[in-house]
């Protein structure tokens, strides 16, 4: 089979690892594994981690048709609806205790987006009306309380009063708007539109209200894509700027190579779902520009550096940056036919399999490596360390049918 090494990475490394993180006593999946592979069964559980696990198992099930994957997706869904979703104020918590009691009750727009992304995938995998209903409720909460007339805001208290955006701000700034949140709003709304179209096409499940709601979400998706194009894309620097104040003034000179290469294909994917010719045509040159910049500036022939701030390059190799780079270059090769992009995807995948993948039995990928390939002291699982990026990389490679492994 094509990309057999990728298939084995998915089925013999990534899936078994996350299967073992399932918490059958308290629900969901364990929230923390140390670098020495010790599971802390009393660690808080990040709701973003649970959403990404839900998305991963739902999507993996649709491709592999393994009932065990469906069971894990159902397990993650039950935890989301029972514990991650706030029955008092709505929306998704930032984290809960190991037993599901609320821990960090912050409501972050980014976190809501990933819940929608996951619930949409779960609906596509199962046809669960309950899942798509929760996704719609979260969408309405975002649109009603987590944005202003100019775009999307970031962090809120449990009852949706504005709060400092410490969770998605870094590098010494406190951002009121971020490229990262908007990118994943686009991702979430695209997935929701795709799921709603499936629902509307089924007379037993969809009705006129669903079609009207779908049209509203399509309009919001179009507006979000235009916002990314008009406010976040920096044509002079060939990148997406990262952190902004409320008036869309960029707060820092930062190039995030991982986000740029991820956005290069996610924006194309979203535009394809929206099927708006004008928006699609306006995004093509942006996607091409982002890929070319990453290829010329961040790719050393084997892997991708992390980011560049004020001319200072961070040369760490981050698991998700490498995974998204494989996918970004693969998608660029599909669009543009440039052999150097297929070769780049091949080389980065080889680097991942050689260096980023932890060869220890019962482990998965190292979160971060130094420039020389030495693993940094990072946990194997935490709220941000998840199967979303590397799992999606494997699934998209396999679905593409393009040999890069």
Swiss-Prot record:
Activity versus pH, per record: Optimum pH is 7.0-8.5.
Protein name, UniProt field: Cellobiose 2-epimerase
Database matches in InterPro entries: 6-hairpin_glycosidase_sf, 6hp_glycosidase-like_sf, AGE/CE, Cellobiose_2_epim
Catalysed reactions listed for this entry: D-cellobiose = beta-D-glucosyl-(1->4)-D-mannopyranose
Source species, domain of life: Bacteria
Keyword field: Isomerase
Function summary: Catalyzes the reversible epimerization of cellobiose to 4-O-beta-D-glucopyranosyl-D-mannose (Glc-Man). Can also epimerize lactose to epilactose.
Pfam families xrefs: GlcNAc_2-epim
Broad enzyme group: isomerase
Species in which this protein is naturally found: Eubacterium cellulosolvens
PANTHER family referenced in this protein's UniProt entry, alphabetically: N-ACYLGLUCOSAMINE-2-EPIMERASE
UniProt GO molecular function: cellobiose epimerase activity
EC number: 5.1.3.11
Thermal behavior of activity: Optimum temperature is 35 degrees Celsius.
Similarity comment text for this entry: Belongs to the cellobiose 2-epimerase family.
Signal peptide: none
């Amino acid at each position: 089979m094509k990309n057999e090494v990728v298939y084995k990475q998915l089925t013999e490394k990534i899936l078994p690892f996350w299967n073992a993180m399932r918490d059958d006593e308290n629900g969901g999946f364990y929230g923390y594994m140390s670098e020495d592979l010790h599971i802390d069964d009393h660690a808080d559980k990040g709701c973003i981690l649970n959403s990404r696990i839900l998305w991963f198992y739902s999507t993996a099930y649709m491709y592999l048709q393994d009932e065990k994957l469906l069971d894990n997706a159902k397990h993650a869904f039950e935890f989301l609806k029972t514990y991650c979703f706030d029955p008092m104020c709505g929306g998704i918590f930032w984290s809960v205790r190991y037993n599901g009691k609320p821990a960090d009750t912050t409501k972050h727009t980014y976190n809501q987006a990933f819940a929608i992304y996951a619930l949409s995938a779960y609906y596509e995998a199962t046809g669960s009306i309950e899942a798509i209903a929760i996704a719609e409720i979260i969408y309405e909460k975002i649109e009603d309380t987590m944005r202003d007339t100019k775009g999307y805001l970031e962090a809120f208290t449990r009852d949706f009063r504005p709060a400092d955006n410490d969770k998605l701000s870094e590098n010494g700034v406190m951002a009121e708007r971020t490229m990262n949140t908007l990118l994943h709003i686009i991702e979430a709304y695209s997935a929701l539109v795709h799921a709603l179209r499936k629902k509307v096409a089924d007379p037993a499940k969809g009705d006129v209200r669903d079609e009207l709601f779908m049209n509203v979400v399509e309009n919001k998706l179009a507006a979000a894509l235009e916002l990314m194009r008009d406010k976040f894309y920096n044509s002079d620097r060939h990148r997406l700027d990262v952190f902004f104040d409320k008036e869309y003034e960029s707060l820092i000179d930062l190039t995030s190579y991982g986000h740029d290469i991820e956005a290069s294909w996610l924006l194309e994917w979203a535009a394809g779902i929206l099927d708006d010719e004008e928006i699609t045509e306006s995004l093509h040159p942006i996607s091409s520009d982002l890929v070319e910049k990453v290829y010329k500036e961040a790719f050393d022939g084997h892997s991708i550096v992390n980011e560049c701030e004020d001319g200072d390059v961070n040369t760490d190799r981050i698991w998700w940056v490498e995974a998204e780079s494989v996918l970004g270059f693969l998608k660029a090769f599909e669009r543009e036919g440039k052999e150097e992009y297929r070769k780049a995807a091949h080389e980065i995948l080889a680097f991942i399999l050689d260096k980023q993948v932890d060869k220890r039995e019962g482990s998965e990928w190292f979160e971060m490596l130094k420039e020389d390939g030495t693993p940094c002291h990072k946990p194997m699982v935490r709220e941000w360390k998840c199967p979303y990026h590397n799992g999606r990389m494997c699934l998209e490679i396999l679905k593409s049918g393009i040999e890069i492994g």
